[in-house]
Each structure stands twice: as C-alpha cells, then as structure tokens.
C-alpha cells in the first residue's frame, strides 16, 4: 500500500491518487468534548508540507464516501484503504469512550451512509497512545447492537502510532476487545525531517511473521527518499506512508522489486498476513 500522508483537503484525495497512492492518511481533530470536528494536522508536521490544511469533518467524510462508492461519479477504484490518524490528545481522557462512540456514528451514517454499498474502503483507526484504547473499545461496542456489525468485522482495523512497546501494544489491543491478528496494523516511524532506523520495523515484521504474533501488517512512515524506500521494502513492510507516492511507485518498478512486490488492489485483504 502506498499511503498518501496528511490528506486533509478534499482536493488532495484525487491529487494523491493521481500521484500513485492507493491509500490515504487523514488527520482527525476533535473538539474539547471529544467530538470529531475537522481534518487537521497542525504544526509541526513534515518538511516541505503545509501543516494547516483543513476541512469540516462532515464535508470531508462526504467527499471520501463519494470517492469510495462504486457507481458514484467521483468514485476512484484506486482508493482501497484509509488510515484515520486520530488526534485524541486534545481532550480529557475521561471523554475517550464517548469520543469513540461519536466517531463510530460518523463512520456509520456519514461514510457508510447506513448502507453496505457506500464507502467501501477499508479503514484503519490509528491512535497516538496506548492509554487511549477506550476509543477503540467504544467504536467496536457501538456496533454490538447494530445491523452494520458485519461492516466493522469486514472493513475496520487498528493501529497505535506512538512507537510504544509492542508487547504492551498486544495487551492493550486485547483490552480494547481486539484479538491477536484481528485486523492489526503496526506502524513505525517519524517525521520525514529526521532519519530513523529500521530496527523497530524489523522487530514488528518478525512478530508479524511469527506463528504466535499479533500483527497482520506493518507500515513505515514518513519517507520519500529512494534509498529509504528500498530499505523499507527490503525489510518486507506492507505499507509505506509518504508525501511523494510517485517515488514508491517508481521503486516498485525497479528490477530488484518488480517481481517481489505489486501495488495492492481492492481484492487484496489488508487484514491478511501475506506469506511468501
């Protein structure tokens, strides 16, 4: 998956897809009560990027639903996976559960439109800290009594992006109601302004490939240097988050990689662990 980073304006959806992405990452900002309010990253962000692009949440989710609904004039078949980078650090932790419920309602009614046929992209809920796990728990429990529980079970995955201890990550996911290998992505990375080693990525890949692991997929962020992309692919990641999708697309065409990797399509399940 080539994951377009910090896609927070409606027009950026097509912009990043046209550059070669098949996935996007969207930053979700919340009000002081934990209700989703805007798409917004804020300062600081990545080098050579504008950090303050924003849309009202309802407008963006409406456009995202259109872009991922077959038959809609704005449908883009390339967009198969959406990572919601949930900025849950801006409100009191006591509101985490209610915030998760509110976001579940937004997805059910504004993205899926209360239908099996709208908003077909797979979704990853990415939280910045392990102690925010009640957001995931609430999101999942919202669908316990819903006729759309099948969509939760088919289309939603989970990630913690804070580069915290992976053994503890497993424990916390279980506390949130997520079983081992139940749609679990493990991200690792840092802003593109700083070089980061692949040590933690390789550790995550080893857990993914272990018979007793809890991870389905591993993502590295945020890179765009050709050498960094090659190193990440050689580490066997499943996704790369980037500001320049064309770089990853070009590397995938190189002799060293063209027979080992291909761009994921909608037929590729982002919850299945790939085995060579």
Curated annotation (Swiss-Prot):
<keyword id="KW-0479">Metal-binding</keyword>
<keyword id="KW-0204">Cytolysis</keyword>
<dbReference type="GO" id="GO:0016042">
    <property type="term" value="P:lipid catabolic process"/>
</dbReference>
<keyword id="KW-1015">Disulfide bond</keyword>
<protein>
    <recommendedName>
        <fullName>Dermonecrotic toxin LlSicTox-alphaIV2i</fullName>
        <ecNumber>4.6.1.-</ecNumber>
    </recommendedName>
</protein>
<feature type="active site">
    <location>
        <position position="5"/>
    </location>
</feature>
<comment type="similarity">
    <text>Belongs to the arthropod phospholipase D family. Class II subfamily.</text>
</comment>
<keyword id="KW-0442">Lipid degradation</keyword>
<feature type="active site" description="Nucleophile">
    <location>
        <position position="41"/>
    </location>
</feature>
<feature type="disulfide bond">
    <location>
        <begin position="45"/>
        <end position="51"/>
    </location>
</feature>
<dbReference type="GO" id="GO:0046872">
    <property type="term" value="F:metal ion binding"/>
</dbReference>
<feature type="disulfide bond">
    <location>
        <begin position="47"/>
        <end position="193"/>
    </location>
</feature>
<keyword id="KW-0443">Lipid metabolism</keyword>
<keyword id="KW-0964">Secreted</keyword>
<keyword id="KW-0800">Toxin</keyword>
<dbReference type="GO" id="GO:0031640">
    <property type="term" value="P:killing of cells of another organism"/>
</dbReference>
<keyword id="KW-0456">Lyase</keyword>
<dbReference type="GO" id="GO:0008081">
    <property type="term" value="F:phosphoric diester hydrolase activity"/>
</dbReference>
<dbReference type="InterPro" id="IPR017946">
    <property type="entry name" value="PLC-like_Pdiesterase_TIM-brl"/>
</dbReference>
<dbReference type="GO" id="GO:0016829">
    <property type="term" value="F:lyase activity"/>
</dbReference>
<dbReference type="GO" id="GO:0005576">
    <property type="term" value="C:extracellular region"/>
</dbReference>
<feature type="binding site">
    <location>
        <position position="85"/>
    </location>
    <ligand>
        <name>Mg(2+)</name>
    </ligand>
</feature>
<feature type="binding site">
    <location>
        <position position="25"/>
    </location>
    <ligand>
        <name>Mg(2+)</name>
    </ligand>
</feature>
<feature type="binding site">
    <location>
        <position position="27"/>
    </location>
    <ligand>
        <name>Mg(2+)</name>
    </ligand>
</feature>
<comment type="function">
    <text>Dermonecrotic toxins cleave the phosphodiester linkage between the phosphate and headgroup of certain phospholipids (sphingolipid and lysolipid substrates), forming an alcohol (often choline) and a cyclic phosphate. This toxin acts on sphingomyelin (SM). It may also act on ceramide phosphoethanolamine (CPE), lysophosphatidylcholine (LPC) and lysophosphatidylethanolamine (LPE), but not on lysophosphatidylserine (LPS), and lysophosphatidylglycerol (LPG). It acts by transphosphatidylation, releasing exclusively cyclic phosphate products as second products.</text>
</comment>
<keyword id="KW-0460">Magnesium</keyword>
<dbReference type="GO" id="GO:0090729">
    <property type="term" value="F:toxin activity"/>
</dbReference>
<keyword id="KW-1061">Dermonecrotic toxin</keyword>
<keyword id="KW-0354">Hemolysis</keyword>
